[in-house]
Every structure is written in C-alpha cells, then in structure tokens.
C-alpha cells in the first residue's frame, strides 16, 4: 500500500511512525495544486490537511481508495466525487474539541472584560495621564 502525505507541515512534527509502518510512505512538507497528481499517481491512500482534492484529481489517481484529512473540516475534498468513485474520506473527528471550547471561553471573557479596550488604554498612555487610578468609562462586569 502506498501512502502519500501532501502537507506534513500541518501536523507540526507530530510522530506518525504508526502510519509510516502501514505501507510505502512518502511525505511532503508542502504541495502545490500542480504537484498533487504527480505525487499521488500511484497512491492508495492520500493524507492532506489543506491541499484540495477535486473530481479531476481523483480521476487522475486510479489507485486511490482512501483520503484522510488531517483536520476536522473536509471542505477541500469533493465528497460527492469521492463517493461516486468509491473512495472513502475520513477526517480527524474531535481532535480540537477542548481547544475550541477554551477559545470560546477565552473570547467570551475577553469581550466581557473588554480586554482589547483596556489593552489599548494602557498602551496609548491614557492610563498614566488619568487623574485617578481607575477608569469608569466602561461598565464593569463580574461572573
């Protein structure tokens, strides 16, 4: 089985030895659209994060049986074309669930506490010019 990873940079050096042991593996740091067919022409499995794989590309890859997306989103893959050709498409379900929740909470707290406003207030020097050590220009909030 020949496995090709088109954009290894996207996994930030994570250990993928278990994938490499599954067959003849070749990984590319990045891949431009015009390099996809040449690099994958004998591949059974293609792993991608951002590289687009459309119907025309699939038609040029007769051995392709599986596309693995190293992300949650699969908008770079023509899913209908893959289904029509019997090519399975899998993604990294739930890999960033905690990060998304943390980012959402962080953003909510940032908005609630007006972090951007106060960051600019301090950096602009307005804080040091103020007659008082507090600022009542904005409402305060607590959780």
Predicted regions mapped to residue ranges:
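Short acidic active-site motifs
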Residues: 32-36, 52-57
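A short, aliphatic-rich alpha-helical micro-motif
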Residues: 39-40, 58-61
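Rossmann-fold NAD(P)-binding glycine/threonine-rich loop
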Residues: 75-87
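Phosphate-binding beta-alpha-beta segment of Rossmann-like dinucleotide-binding domains, i.e.
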Residues: 85, 93-143
């Amino acid at each position: 089985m020949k496995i090709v990873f088109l954009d290894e940079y996207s996994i930030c050096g994570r250990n993928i030895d278990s994938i490499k042991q599954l067959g003849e593996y070749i990984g590319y740091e990045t891949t431009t659209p015009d390099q996809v067919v040449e690099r994958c022409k004998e591949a059974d499995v293609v792993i991608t994060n951002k590289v687009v794989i459309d119907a025309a590309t699939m038609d040029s890859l007769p051995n392709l049986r599986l596309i693995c997306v190293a992300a949650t989103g699969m908008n770079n893959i023509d899913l209908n074309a893959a289904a029509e050709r019997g090519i399975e498409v899998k993604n990294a379900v739930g890999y960033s669930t905690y990060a998304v929740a943390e980012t959402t909470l962080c953003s909510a707290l940032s908005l609630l506490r007006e972090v951007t406003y106060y960051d600019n207030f301090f950096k602009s020097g307005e804080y040091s010019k103020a007659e008082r050590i507090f600022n009542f220009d904005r409402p305060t909030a607590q959780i």
